[in-house]
Amino acid sequence: MATIKIPPVLRASVGGEKEVSASGANVGEVLRDLATNHPATESQLFSADGQLNRYVNVYLNDEDVRVLEGLDTSVGEGDTLVILPAMAGG
């Protein structure tokens, strides 16, 4: 299982937890497992076509998955994913 660090903006969707565990062989599967176990996160993470929302950044062991293999990036036992929704301001 991988550990997912949950940002404050998503914590209400996972019962207030700062970290949750999820299973999967790659980033996409781990995030889908998160969405299965915490359905309120699905629309916050994924677009209608099943792709990761463009404003959501995901890091695997401090590496941006966009520069790795995206949602196909392999996840090993004990790995940590960090979800960081992009923030905009003015």
Task: Please report, for each region that a protein language model flagged, where it lies by residue.
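Ubiquitin-like/PB1-type beta-grasp interaction modules and other compact soluble beta-rich domains
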Residues: M1-G89
